From Swiss-Prot:
Protein name (Swiss-Prot/TrEMBL): Exostosin-1
Residue pairs linked by disulfide bridges in the UniProt entry: 668-716
InterPro entries: Exostosin, Exostosin_GT47, GT64_dom, Nucleotide-diphossugar_trans
Ranges facing Cytoplasmic side: 1-6
Organism: Drosophila melanogaster (Fruit fly)
Tissue occurrence: Ubiquitously expressed in early embryos. Later (in stage 10 embryos), it is expressed at higher level in the nervous system. Ubiquitously expressed in wing imaginal disk.
Segments for region (Disordered): 540-560
Length: 760
């Protein structure tokens, strides 16, 4: 009995000590914790709530988070009565992928009918440019059942209720749209949201629901990552297409220009956005740092001006804005009333490296573009550190940053069309079955818009990425002969001689003959023997066939078009394509030499017949000439090498208006191919040797003998330039010849001896 009491006493004592230790410790670490919270924690296994867990954020990160949360709470308080979108949208929850399985097409709602007063809802110039860019592109469809994306016919760019472009009654207009479905698969473009005095970022004045927002001045707490798209802010005069190219003409040493850092703009003596700009005078020294502001804007600036306004205005008038842009190494891009600024795009175009002073701003297309390669970040709260930041950047990085500003401007930001198409491609890459381009493709020239991932599984097959990836084009070439006249095939015929010459080349892999002539295909026995070289003959739609025609022949359907010579035929398996007219008179050495030159420049057109373009002041139009001058900008594809990717791009990327122009004229396809390649590479073609003529004059009738043929080509050139929005062709005076070409040495020392026998 005594032993039993002792055991009970020991057990009770241990239980009391355990309760005193563990219970007292929990009361000590959370003395103010509510009983209900303690009970819930006990049910969860004693896990502490996240508010009481230790933070691993640094002091700087904690300050940044507090600043963002305070700004967000102010914005929400100012517009808490507005529900502008579904906040938790993702592509998986707010987007119908089944609409996009076949093709990525965009439908635009038709304009609203006139109201009782005979007036239509207003549409701003910029929104009309967006609609025009889509309607004239390959994305557009007039069939809503085939569309993947829907674009509103209602102008939503400016949602500032004080603006003249503000469209009223948007909620009721959205309710009348037949395919609205709470915004699913819709995209809404917006540049300005909110109004004076708080300019709330999420104040659109309507519920966007599940629609994707393509919006300027987006903050990190407002952006639905992986769903919305941040776009740049652009002004009312921004061009629809192409527009001005980057203004950096050279990237020479020294890297620093006259001014190290510059800014010229207005400051706000009251209201949001005034804190940073009102302090910029501390950085201005008038020597290498020029940061000037003015108070002269708005209706009540005189009543609200502060003591510095007069001095700031005098200093402001001393400097020209364009001069500062062109002569500054860095350009400050502070936030204004909203996070974004026009100066961002202006600095990119001028090659003035942007120094961003806008905390929490999500940069345009940030999910794809690596902005560390083109911009510098600064902190609004650490304004006085900006001079030290820009002075610490080495010259080699300044070179790289400046170069990247030009790449991004020309490929993504130079026009409204490029901004809209980039937005579409970002959304397109979110689709489950569409291949995703690498960061290298997005952040190097020519950019993602001109790199179609459906062409090949790997980027190494793109001609302009071979050097950066340390790769070489695949060996050998495919000769493609376009037959338009179809003269009788015999040993003395130009086509017969051409096929025989090609078979002697050491680099040819296959010969493809495109028969577009009205005459029937020659019999198989009339073609020259090609030994081990496969010969394929394709009869283009509309031409006739004879029994047993062609060595390996097939027929396409429909009316033949001259653009069919640039179709991506399955028979073309090599990277190099040798494009030839049926009456070309080149020898084997000329073919081999041109191919070896092309292997060093696989992104360009390399060939023999050269032409030039020029600006005709008397006609205020572009001119085209075949005269022998000291420069050229076109190498005709009647005797030239190029990469097969350009066939794919020509067929699947070019505007349908351009292809229609070629088809209607049955001419100019070679000029269009030159414009395309120059647009992609921003480089001229390459002419080899001094050969001028390349056609057999005994062939007979030829479209080149038609006097209207030349006039037609000038008209085509101007049409192409108008559709591109600028003139892509680039002049060159470079010509490549073989080693010892025309030198007074023995012919036995020369590799390409037949070239020596060719006259001019």
């Amino acid at each position: 009995m005594q032993a039993k009491k002792r055991y009970i006493l020991v057990f009770v004592s241990c239980a009391f000590l355990a309760y005193a230790y563990f219970g007292g410790y929990r009361l000590k670490v959370s003395p103010l914790r509510p009983r209900r919270a303690q009970h819930e924690s006990a049910k969860d296994g004693g896990v502490q709530p996240h508010e009481q867990l230790p933070s691993f954020l640094g002091a700087h990160d904690m300050q940044e988070l507090q600043l963002l949360q305070s700004n967000q709470s102010k914005s929400l308080d100012s517009s808490k009565h507005l529900v502008t979108r579904k906040p938790d949208c993702r592509m998986e929850t707010c987007f119908d992928f089944t609409r996009c399985y076949d093709r990525f097409l965009v439908y635009i709602y038709p304009p609203e009918p006139l109201n009782s007063l005979g007036a239509a809802p207003p549409t701003s110039a910029n929104y009309q440019k967006i609609l025009t860019a889509i309607q004239e592109s390959r994305y557009y469809t007039s069939d809503p059942t085939a569309a993947c994306l829907f674009v509103l016919g209602i102008d939503t760019l400016d949602r500032d209720s004080l603006s003249e472009d503000y469209v009223r009654n948007v909620p009721s207009r959205l309710a009348r749209l037949p395919y609205w479905n709470n915004g699913r698969n819709h995209i809404i473009f917006n540049l300005y949201s909110g109004t004076w005095p708080d300019y709330a970022e999420n104040s659109l004045g309507f519920d966007a629901g599940e629609a994707i927002l393509a919006k300027a001045s987006m903050g990190v707490l407002q952006l639905r990552h992986g769903f919305d798209v941040s776009i740049p802010l652009f002004h009312k005069q921004f061009p629809l297409r192409a527009g001005a190219t980057g203004t950096v003409q050279s990237n020479n040493f020294p890297a620093n220009k006259k001014y190290l850092l510059a800014f010229k703009g207005k400051r706000y003596v009251h209201g949001i956005g005034s804190e940073t700009r009102n302090s910029l005078f501390h950085l201005h020294n008038g020597r290498d740092m020029v940061l000037v502001t003015t108070c002269r804007h708005g209706k009540s600036w005189r009543e609200l001006q502060d003591n510095r306004c007069d001095e700031d205005n005098r200093e402001y008038d001393r400097y020209d804005y364009e001069t500062l842009l062109q002569n500054s190494t860095f350009c400050l891009v502070p936030r204004g009333r909203r996070l974004g600024s026009f100066r961002f795009l202006e600095a990119l175009q001028a090659g003035c490296i942007p120094v961003l002073l806008s905390n929490a701003w999500v940069l345009p297309f940030e999910s794809k573009i690596d902005w560390k390669q083109a911009a510098i970040w600064a902190d609004e709260r650490l304004l006085l550190q900006v001079p030290d930041i820009v002075r610490s950047i080495p010259a080699e990085r300044i070179f790289a940053l400046r170069q990247q500003t030009q790449v991004l401007w020309e490929r993504y930001f130079g026009s409204i069309e490029k901004i809209v198409f980039t937005t579409f491609e970002i959304i397109r890459e979110r689709l489950p079955d569409y291949p995703v381009r690498s960061s290298l493709v997005w952040n190097s020239s020519p950019g993602a818009l001109l790199t179609l991932p459906t062409f090949a599984d790997s980027s190494r097959y793109m001609p302009f990425l071979l050097n950066s990836m340390g790769a070489e084009p695949r060996h050998n070439y495919t000769a493609v002969i376009y037959v338009q006249i179809g003269a009788a095939l015999g040993p003395n015929a130009a086509l017969y001689k051409l096929v025989r010459t090609i078979t002697k080349s050491q680099f040819v892999e296959r010969i493809l003959v495109l028969w577009a002539a009205d005459r029937p295909l020659p019999l198989k026995k009339r073609w020259p023997p090609t030994s081990h070289i496969p010969l394929h003959v394709i009869s283009l739609g509309g031409s006739t066939r004879s029994q047993g025609a062609g060595p390996t022949s097939q027929t396409t359907e429909g009316r033949p078009s001259i653009s069919q010579r640039f179709l991506p035929y399955d028979e073309i398996q090599t990277d190099a394509v040798l494009s030839l007219d049926e009456d070309a008179i080149l020898n084997t050495d000329e073919l081999d030499f041109a191919y070896t030159v092309w292997r060093d420049f696989p992104e360009r057109i390399v060939g023999y017949p050269a032409r030039a373009h020029f600006w005709d002041d008397s006609k205020n139009a572009w001119g085209y000439t075949s005269k022998w001058t000291n420069y050229y900008s076109i190498v005709l594809t009647g005797a030239a090498f190029y990469h097969r990717y350009y066939n794919y791009l020509y067929t699947n990327w070019l505007s349908l208006l351009l292809l229609k122009t070629v088809q209607q004229s049955s001419n100019c396809e070679d000029i269009l191919m030159n414009l395309l390649v120059s647009h992609v590479t921003r480089k001229p073609p390459i002419k080899v040797t001094q050969r001028k003529g390349y056609k057999d004059r005994e062939t007979g009738r030829s479209p080149w003998n038609d006097p209207d043929h030349f006039i037609q080509r000038q008209s085509c050139l101007n049409t192409f330039a108008a559709v591109f929005g600028y003139m892509p062709l680039i002049r060159s005076n470079l010509r490549m010849d073989p080693m010892l070409y025309r030198d007074p040495v023995s012919n036995l020392r020369k590799k390409y001896r037949q070239i020596e026998l060719v006259g001019s």
